[in-house]
Curated annotation (Swiss-Prot):
Protein name listed in UniProt: POC1 centriolar protein homolog B
PANTHER family cross-referenced by the UniProt entry: POC1 CENTRIOLAR PROTEIN HOMOLOG B (PTHR44019:SF1), WD REPEAT-CONTAINING PROTEIN 55 (PTHR44019)
Keyword Cytoplasm among record annotations: yes
Organism lineage string: Eukaryota, Metazoa, Chordata, Craniata, Vertebrata
Entry GO terms, CC: centriole; ciliary basal body; cytoplasm; extracellular region
Functional summary from the UniProt entry: Plays an important role in centriole assembly and/or stability and ciliogenesis. Involved in early steps of centriole duplication, as well as in the later steps of centriole length control.
Subcellular location: Cytoplasm, Cytoskeleton, Microtubule organizing center, Centrosome, Centriole
Alphabetized UniProt keyword annotations: Cilium biogenesis/degradation, Coiled coil, Cytoplasm, Cytoskeleton, Repeat, WD repeat
Pfam family, one: WD40
Entries under SUPFAM superfamilies matching the protein: WD40 repeat-like
Residue ranges, compositional bias (Polar residues): 375-388
Stretches the record annotates as Disordered: 375-427
Gene Ontology biological process terms from the UniProt entry: centriole replication; cilium assembly; epithelial cilium movement involved in determination of left/right asymmetry; heart development; optokinetic behavior; renal system process; retina homeostasis; retina layer formation
WD repeats: 16-55, 58-97, 100-139, 142-181, 184-223, 226-265, 268-307
């Protein structure tokens, strides 16, 4: 294996979403990539050659976040529809859904043990949930504006969050208290995450910067301003030595954190880059953005360097309190600006290989453990863009006809017909029921608001009546005093 770093290369591109790509995450087994989009669908891309991709439908608004459970058997998605869904990333397409917030849910993230979820929302709160029962555990409520992102530390003892109040906050999951606040932004803090060792957190901002803080000393140790527009996302390499970032300037940057410098600028997207993520082994990373395409890159980093680190990290037992692993250098909090020595890569699009065939699946299993979290909305079928009758893009009817013709061959190996076919429920009825449930939810919220207003009105009326009684009593006392002072008539 080569000991000299090679340039990153574009391995594959995936097309199947019909709108902006907003989020992405690799399965820990390194065999799947999940992406969420403004087209309200979740896509599971199987990375094996010629493998089919799955499109999951169920959310009723933009998908904002996606994260695989450590086991790889579940994938969570968050949405502007105020819900979180837990999907089985297979042809079965089953999902459970619960209402998580009273406004858009911006991000979702599993703890390392897979037992908890943390969500961030435009309702200014961060919430933690039990995964098994979809049960609300506790809320963190110190942000004063929309919360854009929340992440567990590698050991699960801390949560980092950031938002439009221009702060990055650190929370203790035991005491549920905010233990530190980092405020050094000229705009919204857009993304936050821990490095693999848990010693540092990084945050990106609308002010074009990426900042790395040592949470043991509470000091800013690195400050990068290498983009020409706001930084929307970033991802730490598993070794902790590198960081990739995506920006509204349409570029992806790769930073060498040990040397504290920009080493690569990658071009490939047309429009803002909204999501980047490394695979768990660090060999691949994916990017997505406003051009509705997903690009998968091979890192080609010096494997001899970081594989040794990964093996040491995986063997470590940590009885000592975190953070416990390598520090990030340099310690000085100087700025890093674009350098002339960096390499710019303009990959050539692969026009020979076809995009994977997309199978539409989606079956909702509602959470019944907590009625307050029920957001009844059954999945509806999304149609492919019409007019594309050849190549990897097919209409829903054409895909269904082809699937019927090759059913035995295609569903060999344990795969079965789609859930809609098994249930026999017409899509029109499903859509109607979904609309009814949404309207009922709106009516419930409206009634709750009216009840609150009625209660306030009653309280104010009661106060007015009490004040009126007091005034009458005072007037009566004044009248008696006047009569007594005047004395009896002559």
């Amino acid at each position: 294996m080569a000991s000299v770093m090679e340039d990153p290369t574009l391995e594959r591109h995936f097309k199947g979403h019909k709108d902006v790509i907003s989020c992405a995450d690799f399965n820990p087994n390194n065999k799947q990539l999940a992406t969420g989009s403004c087209d309200k669908s979740l896509m599971i891309w199987n990375l094996a050659p010629k493998a089919r991709a799955f499109r999951f439908v169920g959310h009723t608004d933009v998908i904002t976040g996606v994260n695989f459970a450590p086991s790889g058997s579940l994938v969570a998605s968050s949405s502007r529809d105020q819900t979180v869904r837990l999907w089985t990333p297979s042809i079965k397409g089953e999902s459970t859904v619960f209402k998580a917030h009273t406004a858009s849910v911006r991000s979702v993230h599993f703890s390392r043990d897979g037992q908890r979820l943390v969500t961030a929302s435009d309702d200014k709160s961060v919430k933690v949930w039990g995964v098994e029962r979809k049960k609300f555990l506790y809320s963190l409520n110190r942000h004063t504006n929309w919360v854009r992102c929340a992440r567990f530390s590698p050991d699960g003892r801390l949560i980092a969050s950031c938002g439009d109040d221009r702060t990055v906050r650190l929370w203790d999951t035991s005491s549920h208290q905010c233990i530190n606040i980092f405020t050094d932004y000229g705009g919204s803090a857009t993304f936050v995450d821990f490095n693999s060792s848990g010693t540092c957190i990084a945050s990106s901002g609308a002010d074009n910067t990426i900042k790395i803080w040592d949470i043991r000393t509470n000091k800013l140790i690195q400050h990068y301003k290498v983009h020409n527009a706001g930084v929307n996302c970033f991802s730490f390499h598993p070794s902790g030595n590198y960081l990739i970032s995506g920006s509204s300037d349409s570029t992806i940057k790769i930073l060498d954190l040990l040397e504290g410098r920009l080493i690569y600028t990658l071009h490939g997207h047309k429009g803002p880059v909204l999501t980047v993520t490394f695979s768990r082994d660090g060999d691949l990373f994916a990017s997505g953005g406003a051009d509705s395409q997903v690009l998968m890159w091979k890192t080609n980093f010096d494997s001899l360097n970081y594989r040794e680190l990964l093996s040491k990290h995986s063997k470590r037992v940590t009885p000592d309190p975190p953070p416990h692993l390598m520090d990030i250098y340099p310690r000085s909090h100087h700025r890093h600006h674009p350098q002339n020595g960096t390499v710019e890569i303009n990959p050539v699009a692969d026009t020979q290989s076809t995009d994977p065939q997309v199978v539409e699946v989606g079956r909702v299993v509602f959470s019944t453990t907590d009625a307050r979290n029920y957001d009844g909305a059954s999945s509806s079928r999304a149609q492919f863009t019409s007019g594309m009758d050849s190549g990897p893009f097919r209409t829903h009817t054409q895909a269904r006809e082809e699937e019927d013709e090759n059913q035995e061959e295609r569903f060999a190996g344990g795969m079965t017909a789609s859930p809609a076919e098994r249930s026999g429920i017409p899509s029109s009825l499903t859509s109607t029921l979904e609309n009814i449930v949404q309207q009922l939810d709106i009516l419930t919220q409206t009634v709750a608001v009216l009840e609150e207003r009625l209660t306030l009105t009653e309280d104010k009326l009661r106060t007015c009546l009490d004040n009126q009684v007091l005034l009458m009593q005072q007037n009566q006392q004044l009248d008696r005093s006047d009569e007594e002072s005047e004395g009896p008539p002559l």
